[in-house]
């Protein structure tokens, strides 16, 4: 068991969750996922990010064993509670911390089926929104989540935590420009959620291959609207002026996959 607070393992983890973690995660191709839920999904997944090293406290090991999870195939290191606290980005660690390898999804391999539904996040900055949208996309059966350059790092601790394990269920493609998406799929229907949209979401029926575009929380996506991008709005009967981005995205995804 590792008990020293000077262990190089702590430094290895801290650099991946630090304020400069985006750069480090990209260079090392690794990210941190904490908690039983993420460990369960990663150990069970046949695709997506794989666990490289699993750090456990004694209580964390009990949780893993109690959940019936088989961690024999990954490097497992026992650490003390103080060491886990030093590694963790949460106030109350669960005693389970996974160092995972970032999945290598190739955008070139993404195909259309005639009824494909994608989500495109344009310069989204809030990690909670990004993670929640990915989680909702998983729940609604969306086929892929695509992010633009300048969007929040989808492998940051806060985003990973907000996905609640859905990161292992849905293909993720990061750093893809809208023009690249359009060039690859020229026939795909592009919808942009906007308060100024003239088309009601409820008017959309059988859109076939479709990508729903959600923009920056503060600036929106008005600059993207035009050409072959259809601006849509969510009709609201109440008095609220607007919806939280993740709530609005969930409504759009539900309609697109249910209609």
Where are these regions (language model features)?
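Amphipathic alpha-helical repeat scaffolds
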Residues: 35, 126-132, 243-248
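Boundary-proximal intrinsically disordered activation/regulatory segments immediately upstream
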Residues: 1-63, 151-153
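RNA substrate-binding interface of SAM-dependent RNA methyltransferases
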Residues: 104-196
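Structured adenosyl-cofactor binding patch, chiefly the S-adenosyl-L-methionine
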Residues: 98, 136-140, 151-168, 223-259
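Glycine/small-residue-rich loop that forms an oxyanion/phosphate-binding "nest" at active or ligand-binding sites
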Residues: 69, 73-99
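Short, aromatic/basic amphipathic alpha-helical patches
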Residues: 62-73, 224-225
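Short acidic-hydrophobic, aromatic-tinged amphipathic segments that line or gate anion-handling sites
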Residues: 1-6, 75-80, 170-180
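Active-site/ligand-binding-proximal alpha/beta "capping" segment
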Residues: 191-241
């Amino acid at each position: 068991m590792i008990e020293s607070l000077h262990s190089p393992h702590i430094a290895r983890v801290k650099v991946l969750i630090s304020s400069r973690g985006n750069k480090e995660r990209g260079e090392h191709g690794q990210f941190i996922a904490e908690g039983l839920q993420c460990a369960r999904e990663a150990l069970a997944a046949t695709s997506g990010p794989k666990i490289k090293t699993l750090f456990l406290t004694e209580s964390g090991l009990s949780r893993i064993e109690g959940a019936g999870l088989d961690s024999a195939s990954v490097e497992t290191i026992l650490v003390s509670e103080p060491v886990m606290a030093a590694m963790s980005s949460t106030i109350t660690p669960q005693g389970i911390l996974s160092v995972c390898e970032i999945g290598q999804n190739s955008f070139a391999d993404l195909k259309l089926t005639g009824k494909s539904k994608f989500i495109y996040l344009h310069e989204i900055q809030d990690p909670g929104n990004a993670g929640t949208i990915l989680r909702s996309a998983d729940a609604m059966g969306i086929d892929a989540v695509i992010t633009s350059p300048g969007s929040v790092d989808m492998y940051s601790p806060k985003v990973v935590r907000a996905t609640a394990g859905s990161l292992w269920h849905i293909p993720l493609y990061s750093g893809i420009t809208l023009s690249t998406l359009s060039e690859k799929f020229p026939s795909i229907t592009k919808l942009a959620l906007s308060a100024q949209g003239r088309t009601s979401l409820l008017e959309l029926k059988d859109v076939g291959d479709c990508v729903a575009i959600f923009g920056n929380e503060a600036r929106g996506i008005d600059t993207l609207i035009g050409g072959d991008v259809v601006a849509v709005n969510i009709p609201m009967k109440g008095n609220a002026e607007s919806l939280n981005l993740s709530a609005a995205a969930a409504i759009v995804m539900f309609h697109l996959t249910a209609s």
